[in-house]
């Protein structure tokens, strides 16, 4: 029940404040402050980028995809704090998000346009002898999509956390032995932490972007 601190700042306060930075703040005023304006711009740009290639049927997914990305960013960013656990490093959670959403896009395609959805399994202009082989390959690639979604998110975050842990341990061990090397290692650790923050946000965006691409094929 101890609240650890980082540079004198209680981490529990940072953990409680971070979601409010990401999620939009409702306001009835004509003019908002800079933070609310930045939040609105970020969410609008993200939604526009995702939904631009989709037709009107895919726009129904706007709230779901935007909420999912904010949810993943929140989990990834909070997991970078010391003494915290990152749920998105668990394959079970990522597969629990990837499989139902991927399956929903496939079911929508089969229900609305079954001919076009099944047509994706056989590229146009395929020679007749290769038709059975290509159908099997395309079917396997279709079922691998949710696994690739979940494994990509898990592997990227796990690798970053392991690197941070190893470099931090090396800096701590080298501090009494070789202070100069320890300081250089700490600088590398700081740069890697900045990179991991970027990776945490980019991987959430890539997860949702790939879902929107799967949706684009079936809507």
Swiss-Prot record:
Any one GO molecular function term: proton channel activity
Single biological process term from Gene Ontology: proton motive force-driven ATP synthesis
Keywords on record: ATP synthesis, CF(0), Hydrogen ion transport, Ion transport, Membrane, Mitochondrion, Mitochondrion inner membrane, Transmembrane, Transmembrane helix, Transport
Effect after changing residue 136 to V: In subspecies Rhodurus
SUPFAM superfamilies: F1F0 ATP synthase subunit A
Membrane topology qualifier: Multi-pass membrane protein
Compartments where found: Mitochondrion inner membrane
Catalytic activity, as annotated: H(+)(in) = H(+)(out)
TM annotation in the entry: 4-24, 61-81, 90-110, 124-144, 172-192, 194-214
Taxonomic superkingdom: Eukaryota
Broad class of the protein's primary localization: mitochondrion
GO CC list: mitochondrial inner membrane; proton-transporting ATP synthase complex
CDD domains, per the entry: ATP-synt_Fo_a_6
UniProt xrefs under Pfam families: ATP-synt_A (PF00119)
Family statement: Belongs to the ATPase A chain family.
NCBIfam families, alphabetized: ATP_synt_6_or_A
Described purpose of this protein according to its UniProt entry: Subunit a, of the mitochondrial membrane ATP synthase complex (F(1)F(0) ATP synthase or Complex V) that produces ATP from ADP in the presence of a proton gradient across the membrane which is generated by electron transport complexes of the respiratory chain. ATP synthase complex consist of a soluble F(1) head domain - the catalytic core - and a membrane F(1) domain - the membrane proton channel. These two domains are linked by a central stalk rotating inside the F(1) region and a stationary peripheral stalk.
Assembly, per entry: Component of the ATP synthase complex composed at least of ATP5F1A/subunit alpha, ATP5F1B/subunit beta, ATP5MC1/subunit c (homooctomer), MT-ATP6/subunit a, MT-ATP8/subunit 8, ATP5ME/subunit e, ATP5MF/subunit f, ATP5MG/subunit g, ATP5MK/subunit k, ATP5MJ/subunit j, ATP5F1C/subunit gamma, ATP5F1D/subunit delta, ATP5F1E/subunit epsilon, ATP5PF/subunit F6, ATP5PB/subunit b, ATP5PD/subunit d, ATP5PO/subunit OSCP.
Name of the protein described by the UniProt record: ATP synthase F(0) complex subunit a
Protein source organism: Oncorhynchus masou
């Amino acid at each position: 029940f101890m609240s650890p601190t980082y540079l004198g700042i209680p981490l529990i306060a940072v953990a409680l404040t971070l979601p409010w930075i990401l999620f939009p703040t409702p306001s009835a005023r004509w003019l908002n402050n800079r933070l609310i304006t930045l939040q609105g711009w970020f969410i609008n740009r993200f939604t526009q980028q995702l939904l631009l290639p989709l037709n009107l049927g895919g726009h129904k997914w706007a709230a779901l995809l935007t909420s999912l990305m904010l949810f993943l960013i929140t989990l990834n960013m909070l997991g970078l704090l010391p003494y915290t656990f990152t749920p998105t490093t668990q394959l079970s959670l990522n597969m629990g998000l990837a499989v139902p959403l991927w399956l929903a896009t496939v079911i929508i395609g089969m229900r609305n346009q079954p001919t076009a959805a099944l047509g994706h399994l056989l590229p146009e202009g395929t020679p007749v002898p290769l038709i059975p082989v290509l159908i099997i390959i395309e079917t396997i690639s279709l079922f691998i999509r949710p696994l690739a979604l979940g494994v990509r998110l898990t592997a990227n975050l796990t690798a970053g956390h392991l690197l941070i842990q190893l470099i931090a341990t090396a800096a701590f061990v080298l501090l009494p032995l070789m202070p100069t090397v320890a300081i250089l290692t700490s600088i590398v650790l700081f740069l890697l932490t900045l990179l991991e923050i970027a990776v945490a946000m980019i991987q959430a965006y890539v997860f949702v972007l790939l879902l929107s691409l799967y949706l684009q094929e079936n809507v």
